[in-house]
Amino acid sequence: MKAEKTSLAVLTAQLTSPDGWQQLLPKGEFRSRDGSPTDVAHWFIDGTIAQNLIHKARQLNQDLLVDYDHETILKAKKGIDAGNVVAAGWFNADEIQWFDDETRQGLYIKPRWTPKAYQQIKDGEFAFLSAVFPYDENGTPLELRMAALTNDPGITGMQRLAVLSATLNPQENVKMPESLRKLLAKLGVEIAEGVELTEEQANTALNALETLQTDKTKADEQVATLSAKNTEVDLSQYVPKATYDAVMSQVAVLSAKTDDVEIDNHISKARNEGRAVEAEVEYLKQFGKQQGVAALSAMLEKRPQIAVLSAQQTQTTKVEKPVEKGTAVLSAADKEAAKLLGISEQDYAKELEAK
């Protein structure tokens, strides 16, 4: 397979952005003021290519160097160890971004300057930022190798370097407030102590906050909708509490009266059947009121019948008058015969005895 031909480009941009984002490459087609590139018609970058550059930088898993006047490249050309190059700053994939609006177009980086470089830029000692990147035969940048502070720009019309006095230098190791760490944790973003907040984490926290605001708005709308609905009570489904309480009170009274009647009936029945005696009537009434009619009935049903009590309480014994001695006992037919004869029953009985 034919190897893809790549070349190395060095371009320069002015440092002017007050928010820390510095233009590294312009949007669209561009060339260097020295006539480069000579092997392709021009270089070209758009949003898609920029995202590929950011992806490549993230795969490095380390910071990219910003040196002074491409000292790293110059030493490499001379065969000198580049390990002694002084860094002016550093940046990573989270500090590379594509802009395309009215004020900014192109690829931007947000370097973390060393204290020395920060002061030099602030004092105007350096004004431009130069990019180093390999490109293919179509002039498409393949990755960002590094950048450099310089006063010899590769292209014209780029933005100048600028810093704000409020810009924080990472060398100062400013600690994130504990309250901010807790707030971010509530939004689902955990930040370890001493670790800086990345752009991705900040966007995650912002999205979580926007979601909470959206949910609150929906909840407020639902409350307003429910409040606006007709709240009149359907009397076919509900009754006033006072009415309910009065009805339940009457039911309780009627139930108590009914229970008393049933208790008396059960006790009376038990006495008639020989299962209870007069002496325990009051006890049985109290038992029924306390334990219920069903419990009283079950208890009395289990009791055996006492024959003596049953006979005394439920049967009436008819005592016949003793018949006078010597007087026959008349049957109903005899009594009717005496009546027809016009004599008394005693006389008729005597006649029967005489016969």
Curated annotation (Swiss-Prot):
Asked if the record carries the keyword NADP, the reply is no
Keywords recorded for this protein, A-Z: Hydrolase, Protease
Transmembrane stretches, start-end: none
Q: What's the domain of life for this entry?
A: Bacteria
Q: Name one GO biological process term.
A: proteolysis
InterPro entries in UniProt: Phage_Mu_Gp1
GO molecular function ontology, one term from the record: peptidase activity
- Function summary: Potential protease involved in virion morphogenesis.
Q: Which family does it belong to?
A: Belongs to the peptidase U35 family.
Name of this protein: Mu-like prophage FluMu I protein
